[in-house]
Amino acid sequence: MNEARVAIVTGAGSGIGRATALRLARDGYSVVVNDLNAERAEAVAATIRAGGGSAIGVVGDVSSESDVVALVRCTEQAFGPCTLLVNNAGFAHQVPFIELAPADFDRIFAVHVRGTYLCSRAVLGSMLAKGHGVIVNVASQLGQIGGVELVHYSSAKAAVIGMTKALAREVSAHGVRVNAVAPGPINTPLVASLSESWRRAKAEQLPLGRFGEPEEVAATIAFLASSEASLFVGQTLGPNSGDVML
């Protein structure tokens, strides 16, 4: 009997996380929809179930070790061990560096970096024991090139890219693949929260001439989760409308 495919998607109540949860459900995964907002998490899970898929919503803060432990416990009780983790939870806000409060800097790192660490650590034991598993971290192109008034966010996403590479080197020989995506401007609530002037100017700069859609990033994540990406280890793919070419 084939092992059940079980995905945890953090920050899946909206945007890229929501699109990823829906895509993975269509691909045959049982999906655990994590979000800080209970209504959003359950709404996404209900949409998946209405389409014939299997899903539950689990509220939790990825920067909290106890919440992450509970998230993995709920996953295993509902569907079995996690075989795919998508570390997507995150947020951003623009602020000049000189005005960036230490508490805001720490919170960005707590969610993006500590959260990625805690969730990866929580599922890795079962993946290593079985000799297979996939982790996909959602970074950002700003982790590669930086962003004005986004020093805290850019630094955290750079750390996520570094963690992706280091962990991939450590566990790939044991059957666990770790990769990342670094989206450019995507039509999500997070990007909508940035200034209109920035969004307008950015759209004009893109070689493709448009922002991406969450579903396009979800397709990249689904590819990295698939057997077709078996040679991708420690890589950071850039669905970014041509904004960054590496």
Language model segments and positions:
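Conserved glycine-rich cofactor-binding loop
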Residues: 13-15
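Substrate-binding pocket helix/loop in short-chain dehydrogenase/reductase
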Residues: 96-97, 104-109, 191, 202
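Residue(s) in the substrate-gating loop at a strand-loop-helix junction
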Residues: 140
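Short C-terminal tail/terminal secondary-structure segment
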Residues: 145, 222, 233-246
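A conserved structural motif in NAD(P)-dependent oxidoreductases
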Residues: 206-217, 228
